[in-house]
């Protein structure tokens, strides 16, 4: 059946609402010659992506005065990234239904994930999912009303569903429309640069935030400084997309990790990420998963003289094996060290990495089938491995060319690139291995609250995931914790308003940092800091990571932060104030991650999930058809590390690492209606 062009356009060209409710300052604060606006609310949400908007919508539904501060309205990772069929992973609602315990086990199967968090995400997926459908997310159904499902990464049960390449953008759109309908107020072009904290020791709690608001710039406030005061704050500005040079994140995605670390909030699982193939960031960054590779395009490289190289044929033993592993990247998209062994699917990524290290450009051609391995037969639909043949047959996609197979299985995947200026039906697509997602982040409890009382983290800002996660589990987690943090905030006892005078010292210090940066000719250059961090992270802490190089990388990151503390950052213009703080946060996040990684390796930590920890003392060696790949010998994972998490806290200018046991799930058999109903009626369960 041919899908009408109008339908394809609706699912790929997704415009965002433009008119939102705004908020005027509640009061003005005079500090020296500056007059600074102060915004008060019962809850502040930082970020306007899918997770932040869900929190804002749920808070407003519960009659909480919520304000959303956002760097760019309805823009960021949720709105601007995706894949072939961007996945939402929830409890299945087709055929035999689902089992929450089994879903929770699947979410945490890779280890290092709290069991109670996994169960919360499993159970909460039903309400989160239904809420999205209710406000208009076009999730596909069969004629009986069951949601269409498929299998994705780390997903044996087939719990994935999708609206196409732009699932998360469509989520942002429908949540934005609901927020507007509910009258949620927004402050656009607002970059939060520091959290405000009240109290000491165990009494520390969130008090608000300092931001740079372009709309508040004026003669008496040249930098646009603004103060937000609130008893509850939700960090929902995403992950640290600028941390790596080789990244598939949209540009200017700094996230909330460094901001939280600076405030002393504990982080967890910073060693856990997702890396995978995607188009390059300087063009149109996008994950090349699912049908982009299940159609089995020809993957090759071009050297600086224009010569073409069928490099994958140097790694796999037969043409059939080569094609099968390109196909399997569709649902084994994230790199996993163990899949580099035994001619598995992550050997594709290793080959791409090695080829790109030699300076060659990697391309994907949808008009040519995989070229043969030397001495073997050509690619043929008559010689496919069983899982490949079954999938293509079930989807009526046993067609001559990759572009035909892709058009049959997912025409939206072609439309998306065409919309962004590249017709993959006509020309090859350049791509590489990129950093795609941080599974770790700020540590939270089962309500999304961090170690700083009143401060929540949701979406990629939160470190709720373990070593691995099913594709689409991150979108689900953001929705579940957007709901849960709203429920807890709405059931808190109202705090008395905080007088802004109590925070003068913190505000004055921030202003002093800005003043010093604007007149600091000897401060570090922003471009230097960016290049230093991104090069080090991609080269020393990427998916190929050499154990003996991490300690030196950590020392370099520590030295960078020491120089920033001593010399400061040169801020060339007033409009660079916000980004100077963001790079300060990236420097902290980089040191935190390398601190955790160095500690993990020193404890004998091995290769799992995101990284191959390469070492001459490693036990495992990937092989190609030409023999062992000795340069990529790696240390294997210690099973006991799956039962632990590494937490990192910034105190007195240094990062400290702690080994923590996983939180377990209480005995669910002890929960009964009559016994537990009062906890719900009185709100006790939220405390």
Regions found by a protein language model. Name each.
Residues 229-287, 472-488:
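Glycine-rich loop(s) and the adjacent beta-strand/alpha-helix scaffold that form part
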Residues 61-82:
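Glycine-rich FAD pyrophosphate-binding loop
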Residues 38-41, 220-232, 451:
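Core beta-strand elements of the Rossmann-like FAD/NAD(P) dinucleotide-binding domain
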């Amino acid at each position: 059946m041919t899908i009408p062009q109008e339908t394809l356009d609706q699912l790929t060209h997704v415009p965002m609402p433009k008119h939102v409710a705004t908020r005027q300052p509640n009061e003005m604060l005079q500090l020296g010659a500056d007059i600074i606006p102060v915004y008060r609310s019962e809850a502040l949400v930082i970020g306007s992506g899918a997770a932040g908007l869900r929190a804002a919508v749920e808070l407003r539904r519960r009659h909480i005065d919520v304000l959303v501060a956002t760097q760019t309205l309805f823009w960021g990772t949720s709105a601007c990234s995706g894949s072939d069929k961007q996945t939402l992973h929830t409890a299945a609602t087709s055929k035999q239904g689902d089992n929450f315990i089994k879903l929770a086990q699947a979410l945490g199967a890779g280890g290092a994930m709290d069991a109670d968090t996994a169960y919360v995400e499993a159970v909460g997926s039903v309400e989160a999912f239904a809420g999205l459908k209710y406000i208009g997310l076009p999730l596909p159904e069969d004629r009986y009303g069951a949601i269409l499902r498929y299998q994705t990464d780390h997903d044996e049960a087939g719990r994935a569903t999708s609206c196409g390449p732009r699932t998360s953008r469509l989520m942002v759109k429908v949540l934005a429309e609901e927020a507007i309908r509910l009258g949620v107020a927004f402050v656009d072009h607002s970059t939060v640069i520091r959290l405000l904290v009240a109290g000491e020791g165990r009494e520390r709690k969130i008090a608000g935030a300092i931001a740079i608001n372009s709309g508040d710039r004026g003669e008496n406030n040249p930098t646009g400084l603004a103060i937000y005061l609130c008893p509850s704050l939700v960090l929902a500005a995403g992950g640290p997309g600028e941390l790596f040079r080789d990244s598939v994140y949209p540009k200017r995605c700094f996230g909330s990790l460094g901001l939280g670390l600076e405030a002393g909030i504990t982080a967890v699982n910073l060693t856990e990420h997702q890396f995978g193939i995607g188009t390059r960031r300087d063009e149109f960054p996008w994950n090349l998963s699912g049908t982009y590779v299940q159609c089995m395009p020809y993957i090759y490289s071009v050297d600086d003289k224009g010569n073409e190289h069928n490099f994958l044929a140097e790694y796999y033993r037969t043409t059939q094996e080569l094609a099968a592993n390109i196909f399997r990247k569709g649902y084994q998209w994230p790199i996993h060290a163990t899949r580099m062994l035994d001619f598995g699917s992550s050997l594709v990524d290793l080959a791409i990495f090695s080829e790109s290290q030699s300076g060659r450009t990697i391309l994907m051609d949808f008009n040519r089938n995989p070229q043969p391995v030397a001495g073997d037969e050509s690619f043929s639909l008559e010689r496919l491995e069983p899982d490949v043949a079954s999938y293509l047959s079930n989807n009526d996609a046993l067609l001559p060319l990759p572009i035909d197979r892709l058009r049959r299985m997912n025409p939206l995947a072609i439309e998306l690139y065409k919309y962004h200026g590249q017709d993959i039906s006509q020309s090859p697509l350049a791509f590489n291995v990129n950093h795609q997602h941080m599974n770790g982040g700020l540590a939270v409890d089962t309500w999304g609250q961090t170690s700083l009382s009143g401060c929540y983290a949701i979406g990629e800002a939160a470190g709720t995931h373990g070593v691995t996660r099913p594709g689409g589990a991150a979108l689900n987690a953001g929705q579940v914790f957007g709901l849960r943090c709203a429920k807890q905030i709405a059931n808190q006892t109202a705090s008395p308003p905080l007088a802004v005078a109590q925070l003068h010292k913190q505000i004055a210090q921030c202003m002093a940092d800005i003043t010093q940066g604007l007149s600091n000719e000897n401060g570090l250059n922003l471009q230097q800091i960016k290049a230093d961090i991104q090069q080090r992270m991609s080269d020393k802490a990427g998916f190929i990571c050499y154990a003996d190089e991490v300690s030196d990388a950590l020392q370099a990151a520590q030295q960078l932060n020491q120089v920033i503390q001593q010399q400061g950052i040169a801020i060339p213009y007033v409009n660079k104030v916000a980004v100077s703080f963001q790079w300060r946060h990236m420097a902290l996040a980089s040191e935190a991650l390398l601190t955790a990684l160095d500690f993990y390796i020193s404890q004998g930590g091995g290769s799992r999930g995101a990284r191959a920890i390469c070492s001459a003392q490693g036990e495992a060696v990937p092989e190609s058809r030409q023999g062992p790949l000795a340069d990529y010998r790696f240390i294997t994972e210690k099973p006991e590390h799956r039962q632990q998490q590494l937490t990192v806290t910034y105190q007195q200018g240094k990062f400290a690492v702690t080994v923590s046991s996983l939180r377990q799930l209480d005995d669910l058999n002890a929960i009964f209606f009559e016994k537990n109903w009062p906890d719900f009626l009185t709100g006790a369960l939220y405390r």
